[in-house]
């Protein structure tokens, strides 16, 4: 992966990395790259290799899941400063959702193999990064739960037939 000068500064200004030391940010930047997706582009697909995670710098991304027989269900919409992808942390390292750019989106990707290697050698960095990801995972779980309750709730008082 090519290290682009200044990615550590972009990471430094992103809220997800707030409070991390300059040394930690430089280490993370060594695994980082800029990526741009156009509206409609798939960033990743459920079941694919979870080989990165992303910080959203600009744009809108939909997190979706297949929900037969309804087709794709949008679980969450992510915007600037949101973090996308935690499946790179958990074997077998497969995406559990789809991610699609709704608008042109600029992201910083962080290579999972590079990151896991860095985290294995730096337990302080691992602690700081994993602590942040617990919040991301809890947020996705909550969003998934709410959306699934809505999708499968069926008709009831004040609800139309689906």
What are these regions (language model features)?
Residues 1-162:
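Cytosolic regulatory regions built on CNB/CRP/Popeye-like sensor folds
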């Amino acid at each position: 992966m090519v290290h682009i000068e200044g990615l550590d500064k972009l990471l430094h200004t992103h809220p997800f990395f707030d409070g991390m030391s300059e040394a930690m940010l430089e280490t993370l930047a060594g695994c980082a790259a800029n990526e741009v997706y156009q509206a409609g582009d798939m960033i990743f697909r459920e079941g694919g290799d979870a080989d990165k995670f992303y910080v959203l710098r600009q744009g809108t991304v939909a997190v979706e899941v297949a929900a037969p027989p309804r087709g794709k269900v949008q679980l969450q919409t992510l915007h600037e400063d949101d973090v996308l992808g935690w499946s790179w942390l958990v074997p077998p390292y497969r995406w559990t959702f789809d991610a699609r750019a709704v608008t042109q989106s600029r992201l910083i990707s962080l290579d999972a193999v590079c990151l896991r290697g860095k985290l294995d050698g730096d337990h302080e960095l691992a602690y700081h990064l994993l602590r942040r990801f617990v919040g991301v995972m809890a947020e996705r779980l909550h969003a998934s739960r709410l959306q699934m309750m809505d999708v499968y709730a069926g008709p009831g008082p004040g609800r139309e037939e689906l």
